[in-house]
UniProtKB/Swiss-Prot annotation:
Keywords in alphabetical order: Calvin cycle, Carbon dioxide fixation, Chloroplast, Lyase, Magnesium, Metal-binding, Monooxygenase, Oxidoreductase, Photorespiration, Photosynthesis, Plastid
UniProt-recorded Gene Ontology molecular function terms: magnesium ion binding; monooxygenase activity; ribulose-bisphosphate carboxylase activity
PROSITE patterns xrefs: RUBISCO_LARGE
Chain positions with N6-carboxylysine modification: K205
EC number(s) given by UniProt: 4.1.1.39
Site (Transition state stabilizer): K337
Family: Belongs to the RuBisCO large chain family. Type I subfamily.
Originating organism: Pyropia yezoensis
Top-level division of the source organism's lineage: Eukaryota
Name used for this protein in its record: Ribulose bisphosphate carboxylase large chain
Single GO biological process annotation from the record: reductive pentose-phosphate cycle
Length: 488
């Protein structure tokens, strides 16, 4: 609804008296606001500048991420400005942290273009993050209404269809990243792909920064990689794949590479998060049209997701990427070399895999979310994992995940094929023990030792990496609620 005559007169009068009205008084703060089912909700962690009231800071965030500027403008009176103003409706101190606050903000759905991550982010994480009134600002979580989600296609393939295409059920997918990630010739690269797949992996993959460099151009990589895929598939009698990274400088180049990946028989292609939201959505539309699985590497996310008080939590990226339409996204390992609190990672996985999620503060989920039947995204666990951790990986991450052992395959002393076999035997022995009703978490090391009695490559892997772990205190453990999370 538009403003009343009295309200317009008051605002106009105050503007001419001072030129500036506090954001809270301009209508961007409403403690009595009744949330609509169609509202988009955002939770920000704000650190106001000294002397700035947290309610005023929250109202400023609401204003600057929707319709406001630094002063009242008379053209507000030409719009339904009451409707279009975002409303900060709740501010809570962050427990056990001084001078930080959680600000809950509601946005009317009409503020955003349908089906556009770029337009959504231009408001939610736009200029507001440089606002001087706050020392730091972090987007912790969002709730997307069903009406808005229905304007997005969601994952191009999704978990269920991918399992059917791969004919893999009842266990995680197994993969590995080609190492070294840069410098191999095309022929040697294809040999790595072949050896890994022949040894028992389901997937090999390009890494995030292999595109089309002087030592190996993209077309050469695609041809040799698919030669390895086809030979290994024929040898093993299983469907296998290799994530061909089609990331490039322009969309024209990316489409050309994606089309060629399909022509040479690939079932999956890959992009990097750094290409941007519009390019990601464009590639997701292409992948659905061409029946291709679309893998997303989250390269670049830690530049804004690791800091506790500024940037954006990775769970928000998970939500946006499910909307955008990717089929895979790297989402953490818990036990590997990369950042990841166990409960936070569980929250990421639930965001990608569940049809409905409830509020769960230890997992960092501040809002309940109905996913409006969007397909499930397969989380990918990679970075510093090896066969000796298989019981932990299965316990923390479950079946619906791609476990990628890069160094844990290619670093095996007996060769790549032996490394792949070690991982396949470790996984299948653990899944079998679980299905038999054994306490595979407590008995995990013994289960692996028993399996290694008849699998030399697994024994070698266990001997080599038995003491390898990455026990660092996580930077992303919840500080706003007590959790049982240990440093694992």
């Amino acid at each position: 609804m538009s403003q009343s005559v009295e309200s317009r007169t008051r605002i106009k009068s105050e503007r001419y008296e001072s030129g500036v009205i506090p954001y809270a008084k301009m209508g961007y703060w409403d403690a009595d606001y009744v949330i609509k089912e169609t509202d988009i909700l955002a939770l920000f962690r704000i650190t106001p500048q000294p002397g700035v009231d947290p309610i005023e800071a929250s109202a400023a965030i609401a204003g600057e991420s929707s319709t406001a500027t630094w002063t009242v403008v008379w053209t507000d009176l030409l719009t339904a400005c009451d409707l279009y103003r975002a409303k900060a409706y709740r501010v809570d101190p962050v427990p056990n942290v001084a001078d930080q606050y959680f600000a809950y903000i509601a946005y009317d759905i009409d503020l955003f273009e349908e089906g556009s991550i770029a337009n959504l982010t231009a408001s939610i994480i736009g200029n507001v993050f440089g606002f001087k009134a706050v020392k730091a600002l972090r987007l912790e979580d969002m709730r997307m209404p069903v009406a808005y989600l229905k304007t997005f296609q969601g994952p191009a393939t999704g978990l269920i269809v991918e399992r059917e295409r791969m004919d893999k059920f009842g266990r995680p997918f197994l993969g590995a990243t080609v190492k070294p990630k840069l410098g191999l010739s095309g022929k040697n690269y294809g040999r790595v792909v072949y050896e890994g797949l022949k040894g028992g992996l389901d997937f090999l993959k390009d890494d995030e920064n292999i595109n089309s460099q002087p030592f190996m151009r993209w077309r050469e990589r695609f041809l040799y990689s698919m030669e390895g895929v086809n030979k290994a598939s024929a040898s093993a009698g299983e469907i296998k794949g290799h994530y061909l990274n089609v990331t490039a400088a322009t969309m024209e180049d990316m489409y050309e590479r994606a089309e060629f990946s399909k022509e040479v028989g690939s079932i999956i292609c890959m992009i990097d998060l750094v290409i941007g939201y519009t390019a990601i959505q464009s590639m997701a539309i292409w992948a659905r049209k061409h029946d291709m699985i679309l893998h997303l590497h989250r390269a670049g996310n830690s530049t804004y997701s690791r800091q506790k008080n500024h940037g954006m939590n990775f769970r928000v990226i998970c939500k946006w990427m499910r909307m955008a339409g990717v089929d895979h996204i790297h989402a953490g390992t818990v036990v590997g070399k990369l950042e990841g609190d166990p409960l936070m990672i569980k929250g990421f996985y639930n965001t990608l895999l569940e049809s409905d999620t409830d509020i769960n503060l230890p997992q960092g989920l501040f809002f309940a979310q109905n996913w409006a039947s969007l397909r499930k995204v397969v989380p990918v666990a990679s970075g510093g994992i090896h066969a000796g951790q298989m019981h932990q990986l299965l316990d923390y991450l479950g079946d619906d995940v791609v476990l990628q052992f890069g160094g844990g395959t290619i670093g095996h002393p007996d060769g790549i094929q032996a490394g792949a076999t070690a991982n396949r035997v470790a996984l299948e022995s653990m899944v079998m023990a679980r299905n038999e009703g054994r306490n595979y978490v407590a008995e995990g090391p013994q289960i692996l030792r028993d399996a290694a009695k008849t699998c030399g490559p697994l024994q070698t892997a266990l001997d080599l990496w038995k003491d390898i772990s990455f026990n660092y205190t996580s930077t992303d453990t919840a500080d706003f609620v007590e959790t049982p999370t240990a440093n694992i």
